[in-house]
Amino acid sequence: LFPNLTIEKNIAFGLENTERSKNEINERVSELLDLIGLPDQGPKYPAQLSGGQQQRIALARAIASGPGLLLLDEPLSALDAKVRVYLRHEIKILQQKLGVTTIMVTHDQEEALSMADRIVVMNEGKVEQIGTPNEVYCKPETLFVADFIGEMTQFRGTISGKSLVKIGNTELNMVEHRFSQGREVSITIRPEDIIPLGAKLPAKSGKNVFSAQLVEMEFLGSFWRCKLKSDEFPEALVTADFSVNAVRRLSIETNQILWIELPSESILAFDFQAA
């Protein structure tokens, strides 16, 4: 924003050299101020507004001339966490009201998942995957996408059957895959998909059930991020996200030996890439 111009003048800047009359420009500015929820802020200067309000004014200025395409280049990166979460919701609602095709560049995966209708994941200038947020997160097409969007525990494995993979001496059940038997692959699972079963092995348990030592717990508000060490997977620590309720219910604590389940439908295989 231009610091020496009022909010009204900032929004009107792109309209002043058009064929619109002064009354039409004033009406458009008033309409946009109402749209972004700042109807009484027109006479103020940018320095008198919060960072979040300034971003909304900048967006109003960008759409004042009625563009057919809008490019937002990391518009929320300079804001604090709470304002960022609030504004991404506001921008999405505003974009839907306007119906303007919008491309938003971001390095914030959570921002992309929450705001986008479709996501393009790029790596060194090349497109890795295009899809809905759900497709990109739940059905990543490459190891880069799987690792970049959200957290992943990664293992080196060998395909041992149509729905089987071997990691060291341990065989895991998984969904059917496209790889031939004996193929070396990278195996991944998301932390939130790992199920804690407790200190004792339940009488009824599914496939892919193992014991592991809980070596680290990090409290992240609504869940605990845990690091687990298992003899079944000597290569790497397993990262698991357990809900606060699950930790309380199962009395989970650091250094405990815990039984966990890796659901077969949550295990994904990709072309092997060295870490």
Regions found by a protein language model. Give the residues of each.
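ABC ATPase nucleotide-binding domains
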Residues: 1-144
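C-terminal boundary and immediately downstream tail of ABC-type ATPase nucleotide-binding domains
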Residues: 138-161, 188
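Glycine/charge-rich catalytic "coupling/switch" loops of P-loop NTPases
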Residues: 169-218, 244-275
